[in-house]
Amino acid sequence: MEVLYSISKTLKDARDKIVEGTLYSNVSDIIQQFNQMIVTMNGNEFQTGGIGTLPIRNWTFDFGLLGTTLLNLDANYVETARTTIEYFIDFIDNVCMDEMTRESQRNGIAPQSDALRKLSGIKFKRINFDNSSEYIENWNLQNRRQRTGFVFHKPNIFPYSASFTLNRSQPLHNDLMGTMWLNAGSEIQVAGFDYSCAFNAPANTQQFEHIVQLRRALTTATITILPDAERFSFPRVINSADGATTWYFNPVILRPNNVEVEFLLNGQIINTYQARFGTIIARNFDTIRLSFQLMRPPNMTPAVNALFPQAQPFQHHATVGLTLRIDSAVCESVLADSNETMLANVTAVRQEYAVPVGPVFPPGMNWTELITNYSPSREDNLQRVFTVASIRSMLIK
C-alpha cells in the first residue's frame, strides 16, 4: 500500500511540475525520484482486472530514464516524460480499481488483488516512501492492530432512521402525544408533540427523551445543538404504526424547556449539558441521550389561547424539538463524511464494472446497512478500499 501511494505521489508531482520551459534544477529532485521508480519497476509484469466486467489487462515495464540537462526542459524532453507518466497513471488507476472491487472476510486490511500483493514485495521497497497521507498512516497502524484515528467533518455515523412513538393515542388518532425523529448522517432531529398542549399533564408539562447509540465511539467531537427541529415544523400526513390508517400532524412550534444532553461511554456519563445551545464539545462517547420538556404556556394572548383549546377538536399540535449535529470528530474506524468522496468513488467503480455481491459488503455499498452492522471484517475492508480510493483520487478525479 505504501508503494502504491509513493508511486502515485511521484506521478502527481511529475505530471504537475515536469512542464516545458521549467529549469531542470527546479525539478531535479522529482526527476531523480521518477527515475528511481522506473529502475525499480522495469522488468516486472502485472495483471489487473478479471472481476465483474473489469477487463483483464497485462502490464509490462521497460522505460528509459529521464536525462539531465543544464537548460530548460524542452518539448521533446517533456513529451518523453509524459508518455511514461501516462502509462504509469493508467497502471495505478487499474490497480486501484482492481483492489476496490475485492473483499475478504479474513484479514481484509491486507491487499487483495494480485497486482497490489506483488507491489508489496521486498523488491519494491527501493521506491522512495511517502507516508504523509492520513489514510496511509492509519492503514499502517490498523495493519499492525494498533490504535488508529481519523478526523471527520460531518461524519456519517448515524444510520438512517425515521419513525415515531406514541405515548397517548386513540383509534381516531385525534388526541396524540409522542415523539418523532429523523437520524441520518451526522444529524439528529427529534420532536415531542402533544395535541392538547400538556393540558392534563402533571404541572402542565410533558417529558420527552430520545436515545441514540452509535456503532462506533467518537472522541473530541465538536457539536452544534439547536432548540428546534425544522424537519418537523410543517404539516404532514403520517402512516399509523400498523399501516391501517393515516393521521394528521399540524405543528405549532414552542421552545423546549429543561433541555439536557448527555454523552455516555459504556453506560457512564462523560459530558452533560443543560439548557445550552450552539457549539459544545464531547470528549468520548458511544451514546447520546436527549431529554426535553413541553410546557403549556401559563400566560397566553387570545390568539395563542385559541391555538391550544382545553378540549377537542385539537386543530393545532404543540411541538418542541431539538437538532444535534456532529460538525467534526475523531473515530478509530473509517467512516464516510461530507469532506470526502471515498464512498462514492468505491461504489461507482463497483457499480460501473458490475462487481458481484461478495461476503463482506452489502449490495450497492448501502451505507445505512453497512454502518448498522459494522463488523470488524467490514471495518478492515472498508479502510483498505478507502485508502486505495484516496490514492486513486490523487491522479483520477
Curated annotation (Swiss-Prot):
InterPro entries: Capsid_hemagglutn, Rotavirus_A/C_VP6, Virus_capsid_a-hlx_vir. Keywords: Calcium, Capsid protein, Intermediate capsid protein, Metal-binding, Ubl conjugation, Virion, Zinc. Intermediate capsid protein that self assembles to form an icosahedral capsid with a T=13 symmetry, which consists of 230 trimers of VP6, with channels at each of its five-fold vertices. This capsid constitutes the middle concentric layer of the viral mature particle. The innermost VP2 capsid and the intermediate VP6 capsid remain intact following cell entry to protect the dsRNA from degradation and to prevent unfavorable antiviral responses in the host cell during all the replication cycle of the virus. It comes from the Viruses. One of its GO terms (cellular component) is viral intermediate capsid. Belongs to the rotavirus VP6 family. GO terms for molecular function: host cell surface receptor binding; metal ion binding; structural molecule activity. Zn(2+) binds at H153. The keyword Ribonucleoprotein does not apply. Residues 62-73 are annotated as: Interaction with the inner capsid protein VP2. Homotrimer. Interacts with the inner capsid protein VP2. Interacts with the outer capsid glycoprotein VP7. Interacts with the outer capsid protein VP5*. Signal peptide: none annotated. It is found in: Virion. This is Intermediate capsid protein VP6. Its main location: virion.
